[in-house]
Each structure stands twice: as C-alpha cells, then as structure tokens.
C-alpha cells in the first residue's frame, strides 16, 4: 500500500499565488500577514521581488473565483490561496456571496487540478472575524500551512 502525504518541509520549489479581497481589509490584511508569516517560516520567499509568490487583490470575495481560475489555469502555480471575509449583515446578500465564492473556489480546484485553499471567513459579526484573523488565532497561518501541504502532496501523487 502506498501512502501519500504532503510535507511542510518540501516547500522549497513551490510557486504560490494568493488572491486577497479588499473588502473587509481590516480582517483580510491580518489573514494575509498570518499567511505570509507561515509561508516565510517554511522557506517560501515572500519578498516583493520573490519568484515563488505572487499576490493579487480583488474588490471583494465574490470576485475571488474568477481571478483564482485565471491564476490556476495559467500553469505557473502549484497552489492558489484565497483570502476573504464575508460578514453577515441585515440582508440576504451574505448568503448569496458565501454560496457563490465557496462553490466557485471548489470549482476552480476541480477544473484546474490545482489546489485552491479556501481561506474566506464567513462570520456573523466583525468580532468573530477579528478573532479568527489574529485576536485569538490567525487562520491565515493555517491557510498557508494547508497550501504547503497540498502543494507537496500534489507533487508526490503520480498524474
């Protein structure tokens, strides 16, 4: 029996794209900081001149799948990380955005064969979002770790 597992220490040659929503940037900026910290501590060059990492900003979470698809389909990246924050309001808008971004990100991964990490927070309040972006823990770090594991795993599984 063969067992396939991703390793966090096999990140050296990975090419990673990160798509970040500007809307709720108080939250998404913190997620990005946590994500970049994780990637850096695991050997990914996160400098502005990096050839391993590209960063793309979109207006909001709804736009994430479109750009994630373009990046994943380019053949340049081993993994794409998506970061956003959708916070419930008084209208059904939350439900529409959350449904479309989650389905869209999943579809990009299935169609492209490139792992796409779903790092879009879906919370009822700003406080909940902030707790997940750094007050209690920073899920951006976890999303970075998931990207490293999936990038490594995909390299180890024969096509």
Curated annotation (Swiss-Prot):
Pfam families: DMRL_synthase. GO terms for biological process: riboflavin biosynthetic process. Pathway: Cofactor biosynthesis; riboflavin biosynthesis; riboflavin from 2-hydroxy-3-oxobutyl phosphate and 5-amino-6-(D-ribitylamino)uracil: step 1/2. It comes from the Bacteria. 5-amino-6-(D-ribitylamino)uracil binds at residues 23, 61-63, 85-87, 118. It is an enzyme of class 2 (transferase). The active site is at 93 (proton donor). One of its GO terms (cellular component) is cytosol. Its EC number is 2.5.1.78. The keyword rRNA processing does not apply. It catalyses: (2S)-2-hydroxy-3-oxobutyl phosphate + 5-amino-6-(D-ribitylamino)uracil = 6,7-dimethyl-8-(1-D-ribityl)lumazine + phosphate + 2 H2O + H(+). GO terms for molecular function: 6,7-dimethyl-8-ribityllumazine synthase activity. (2S)-2-hydroxy-3-oxobutyl phosphate binds at residues 90-91, 132. Keywords: Riboflavin biosynthesis, Transferase. Belongs to the DMRL synthase family. Catalyzes the formation of 6,7-dimethyl-8-ribityllumazine by condensation of 5-amino-6-(D-ribitylamino)uracil with 3,4-dihydroxy-2-butanone 4-phosphate. This is the penultimate step in the biosynthesis of riboflavin. This is 6,7-dimethyl-8-ribityllumazine synthase. The gene is ribH.
């Amino acid at each position: 029996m063969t067992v396939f597992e991703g390793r966090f220490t096999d990140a050296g040659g990975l090419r990673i794209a990160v798509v970040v929503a500007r809307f709720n940037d108080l939250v998404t900026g913190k997620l990005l900081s946590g994500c970049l910290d994780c990637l850096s501590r695991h050997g990914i060059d996160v400098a502005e001149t990096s050839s391993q990492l590209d960063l793309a900003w979109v207006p909001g979470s709804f736009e994430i799948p479109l750009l994630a698809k373009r990046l994943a389909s380019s053949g340049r990246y081993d993994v794409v990380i998506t970061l956003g924050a959708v916070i419930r309001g008084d209208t059904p808008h939350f439900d529409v955005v959350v449904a479309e971004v989650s389905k869209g990100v999943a579809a990009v991964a299935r169609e492209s064969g490139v792992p796409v990490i779903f790092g879009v927070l879906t919370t009822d309040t700003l406080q909940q979002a902030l707790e997940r972006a750094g007050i209690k823990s920073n899920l951006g770090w976890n999303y970075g770790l998931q990207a490293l594991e999936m990038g490594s795993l995909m390299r180890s599984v024969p096509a």
